[in-house]
């Protein structure tokens, strides 16, 4: 990527990085290690692995619902520094949506950095005052018979939503199922992808 291919924000980030390295404030190797960690060892692909395992292994799902930290560790995943990570399951009768009303508390190790909309004041306030309206804006319309639970993530407790497994996925293996799980579905503002959507 040449300098001319960079966006103005990328140019500023590169300039800031260069200044910090030149001034001895940042170790380039440590910075590279941090980037490598975020690219390979944290992110929504890890949360998707947890969800896919829960979809195919009822005993694992029970352990996940009982203690998400321990269940994630079973898969060799570090759920991050939050003392408590709670997994909740969306069903035909109950749907969960996660918000942090104070800032942007979020299970980064399993879902990666939070999306900009998750940190925005409109989402943080409307997810509490008008959660069905927010879901509708994301393309999720719940029936009147579905109980909607809004979960407030904090510094002490983070949430991972286990979305409903899509229909038509009985023959898929765990990796194929994980490809259907999106970050937004693990926050509760979207459904997982349909098998045809993931293949496209």
Question: Model features per residue range: what roles?
Answer:
Residues 1-200:
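Terminal, compositionally biased segments used for targeting/anchoring and flexible tails
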């Amino acid at each position: 990527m040449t300098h001319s291919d960079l966006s103005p924000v990328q140019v500023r980030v590169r300039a800031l990085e260069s200044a910090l390295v030149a001034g001895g404030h940042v170790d380039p190797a440590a910075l590279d290690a941090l980037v490598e960690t975020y690219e390979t060892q944290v992110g929504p692909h890890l949360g998707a692995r947890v969800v896919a395992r829960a979809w195919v292994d009822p005993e694992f799902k029970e352990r996940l619902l009982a203690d998400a930290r321990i269940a994630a560790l079973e898969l060799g995943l570090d759920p991050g520094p939050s003392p408590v990570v709670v997994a909740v399951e969306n069903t035909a009768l109950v749907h969960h949506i996660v918000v942090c009303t104070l800032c942007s508390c979020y299970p980064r190790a399993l879902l990666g950095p939070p999306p900009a909309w998750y940190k925005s004041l409109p989402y943080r306030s409307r997810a509490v005052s008008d959660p069905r309206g927010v879901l509708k804006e994301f393309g999720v319309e719940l029936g009147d018979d579905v109980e909607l639970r809004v979960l407030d993530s904090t510094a002490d407790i983070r949430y991972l939503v286990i979305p409903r497994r899509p229909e038509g996925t009985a023959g898929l293996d765990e990796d194929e199922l994980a490809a259907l799980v999106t970050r937004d579905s693990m926050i509760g503002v979207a459904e997982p992808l349909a098998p045809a959507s993931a293949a496209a």
